[in-house]
């Protein structure tokens, strides 16, 4: 009877560990998705920075191709190569010099890179915790297998 209780305790602990493993895997997936979004935002900022630097080098009234979506473009003349309209959030936009816009982009990129580093650190911590839980679950599964084998031998003999 004591062997059966031991087997039940092992099963309960194993089920608890499996639930923990599933929770950790879910957290890791969410953090990976967050990192993907951050990296996408960084890439977008890099494209904007490159575009603004290109606009800054234009000499007034030069014709450029402006993307309108679905790999389609319109021809346009840039009349002001010193100022741009920049969104600052909540649907609000302000006029800034290109240099101010570039500085703002750099600040945003630094914030995003910091957030990415923090997310990657958290991901690494969760991966280590997951590995430890998986190791413990493997040990318990082996203990359970051994306990079941002993129970079969003593019950069959």
From Swiss-Prot:
Listed GO biological process terms: protein folding
Cytoplasm in keyword set: yes
InterPro entries: PFD_alpha_archaea, Prefoldin, Prefoldin_subunit_alpha
Subcellular location: Cytoplasm
Main location: cytoplasm
Coiled coil: none
Alphabetized Pfam families for the sequence: Prefoldin
Keywords, comma-separated and alphabetical: Chaperone, Cytoplasm
Keyword Cytoplasm: yes
GO cellular component, one term: cytoplasm
Gene Ontology molecular function terms on file: unfolded protein binding
Leader sequence residues: none
Physiological role: Molecular chaperone capable of stabilizing a range of proteins. Seems to fulfill an ATP-independent, HSP70-like function in archaeal de novo protein folding.
Subunit structure: Heterohexamer of two alpha and four beta subunits.
Record-stated family: Belongs to the prefoldin subunit alpha family.
Name this protein carries in UniProt: Prefoldin subunit alpha
Organism: Methanopyrus kandleri (strain AV19 / DSM 6324 / JCM 9639 / NBRC 100938)
């Amino acid at each position: 009877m004591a062997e059966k209780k031991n087997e039940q305790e092992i099963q309960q602990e194993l089920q608890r560990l499996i639930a923990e493993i599933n929770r950790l895997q879910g957290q890791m997936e969410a953090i990976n998705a967050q990192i993907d979004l951050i990296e996408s935002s960084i890439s977008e900022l890099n494209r904007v920075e490159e575009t603004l630097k290109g606009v800054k080098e234009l000499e007034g009234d030069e014709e450029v191709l402006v993307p309108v979506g679905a790999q389609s473009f319109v021809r346009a003349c840039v009349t002001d190569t010193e100022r741009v309209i920049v969104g600052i959030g909540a649907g609000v936009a302000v006029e800034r010099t290109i240099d101010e816009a570039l500085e703002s982009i750099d600040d945003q990129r630094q914030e995003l890179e910091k957030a990415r580093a923090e997310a990657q650190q958290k991901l690494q911590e969760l991966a280590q915790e997951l590995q430890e839980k998986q190791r413990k679950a493997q040990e318990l599964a082996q203990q359970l297998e051994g306990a079941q084998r002993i129970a079969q031998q003593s019950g069959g003999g």
